[in-house]
């Protein structure tokens, strides 16, 4: 994965790839905390006498605060930096995961999941911004794919791991194990991560290679925090990215929360068997994420292909493959169902690193966290909607068919947004003093006076 590079005949060390691996491990553990509920759901449903609609609400509990805090988390990240926000976030999500162990009913589990959503809100924006700092543009796709693929790979190893723990020790231990892993990552991040300019283990040769290759400049914008937010919300490019990535998020979170339950209910599998089958689409997604969304993009750009065309081609084609979810509505055979879901998730996973690399590619200086926060806010509103809508549809129809059809329609809207609204993948100019003055004037004239 880490490949040797040279500058003026000098071999460039690979400290940046160690940081990329650290970020990937963080997302992997982060997602263990998310998927453990989907695995433990059958036991918890029985223990607390919960309906499918109740489970849909529990699945969404994480996403309400997680989504609502995305923009504040992005602003906070741009103000205080990757190092501080990353450390506090890692500590708090370990603490929040541990709280779930002691929940005693629907209300306790809902509250614990909501706290986890608060704690993990800065997670992906931190990884996106850190990747922008640490990697030149020509390596950005693979670097982004490392942490994004970790989210998919968590379902390959996390679902079976948590399933074994849940079956043998009960659902509470499923949450306890992920809490311990979260605290271990906090210690690793505390010891290892620094921004490039402050990392004593980063050689001058590699720092020069990173900076001259178009890495995102460290530092803050001259615009105020809220001035940057207001400025970015006027940009069509930001809205195109936001709508498109939200559409991706609906299908992703539907599968993340409901896939094991779909296999248990529709295909009549046990918890352990459903965990094994559910791992297959996520394994496919991990491979396409790294190979297509990561390596292939960097390879084509390095060979001189147009950057916008390459990234957009993978983005849109991946979303089109996501429409294979329609195929799963036409079968009751578990093998064919997994086949269609694997194609859908594989396509979405190939598109995802492009989406996550875009904030560091299009944002003005000091605005990466804010763009990432806006994008991930909409993405995780779908994380709220997908499990709730799916739960109510399944409860009303006793079938997942219409739930999958809804996901396909939303994907089609996202494809249109990426193609026709977002435009070229180019950096948005920094806001000027005139932009700031205009924003303030607009704010004053729109404020009622008495």
Model regions and ranges:
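Extracytoplasmic gate region of multi-pass secondary transporters
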Residues: 37-38, 233-291, 352, 356, ...
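Helix-breaking motifs and short loop linkers at transmembrane-helix boundaries and internal kinks
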Residues: 49, 81, 102-108, 119, ...
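Central cavity-lining transmembrane alpha-helices of secondary-active solute carriers
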Residues: 60-75, 279-293
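Conserved MFS/SLC helix-loop-helix module at the cytosolic interface between two early adjacent transmembrane helices
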Residues: 68-107
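Cytoplasmic helix-loop-helix junction between adjacent transmembrane helices
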Residues: 112-153
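Helix-loop-helix hairpin linking two adjacent transmembrane segments in secondary transporters
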Residues: 147-200
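C-terminal transmembrane helical hairpin of 12-TM major facilitator-type secondary transporters
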Residues: 308-355
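A late C-terminal transmembrane helix in Major Facilitator Superfamily
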Residues: 360-397
């Amino acid at each position: 994965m880490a490949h040797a590079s040279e500058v003026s005949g000098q071999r460039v060390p690979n400290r940046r790839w160690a940081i990329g691996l650290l970020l990937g491990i963080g997302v992997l553990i982060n997602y263990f905390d998310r998927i453990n509920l989907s695995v433990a759901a059958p036991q918890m449903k029985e223990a607390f006498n919960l309906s499918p609609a109740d489970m849909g609400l529990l699945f969404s509990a994480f996403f309400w605060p997680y989504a609502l805090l995305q923009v504040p988390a992005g602003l906070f990240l741009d103000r205080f930096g990757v190092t501080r926000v990353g450390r506090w976030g890692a500590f708090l999500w370990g603490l929040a995961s541990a709280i779930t162990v002691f929940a005693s009913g629907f209300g306790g589990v809902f509250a614990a999941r909501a706290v986890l959503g608060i704690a993990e809100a800065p997670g992906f924006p931190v990884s996106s911004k850190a990747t922008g700092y640490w990697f030149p543009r020509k390596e950005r796709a693979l670097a982004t794919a490392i942490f994004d693929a970790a989210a998919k790979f968590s379902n390959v190893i996390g679902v079976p791991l948590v399933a074994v723990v849940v079956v043998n020790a009960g659902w509470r231990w499923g949450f306890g194990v992920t809490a311990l892993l979260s605290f271990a990552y906090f210690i690793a991040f505390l010891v290892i991560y620094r921004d490039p300019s402050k990392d004593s283990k980063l050689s001058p040769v590699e720092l020069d290679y990173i900076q001259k290759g178009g890495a995102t400049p460290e530092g803050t914008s001259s615009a105020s925090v809220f001035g940057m937010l207001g400025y970015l919300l006027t940009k069509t490019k930001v809205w195109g990215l936001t709508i498109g990535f939200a559409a991706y998020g609906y299908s992703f979170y539907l599968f993340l929360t409901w896939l094991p339950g779909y296999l248990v209910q529709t295909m009549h599998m046990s918890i352990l068997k459903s965990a094994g089958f559910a791992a297959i689409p996520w394994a496919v997604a991990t491979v396409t994420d790294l190979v297509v969304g990561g390596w292939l993009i960097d390879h084509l750009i390095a060979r001189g292909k147009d950057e916008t065309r390459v990234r957009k081609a993978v983005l849109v084609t991946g979303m089109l493959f996501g429409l294979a979810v329609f195929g799963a509505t036409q079968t009751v055979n578990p093998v064919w169902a997994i086949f269609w879901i694997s194609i859908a998730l594989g396509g979405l996973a190939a598109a995802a690193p492009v989406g996550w690399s875009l904030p560091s590619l299009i944002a003005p200086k000091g605005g990466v966290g804010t763009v990432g926060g806006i994008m991930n806010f909409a993405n995780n509103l779908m994380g709220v909607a997908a499990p709730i809508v799916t739960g109510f549809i399944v409860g009303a129809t006793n079938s997942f068919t219409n739930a999958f059809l809804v996901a396909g329609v939303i994907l089609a809207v996202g494809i249109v947004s990426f193609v026709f609204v977002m435009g070229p993948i180019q950096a948005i100019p920094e806001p000027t003093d005139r932009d700031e003055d205009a924003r303030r004037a607009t704010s004053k004239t729109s404020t009622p006076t008495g």
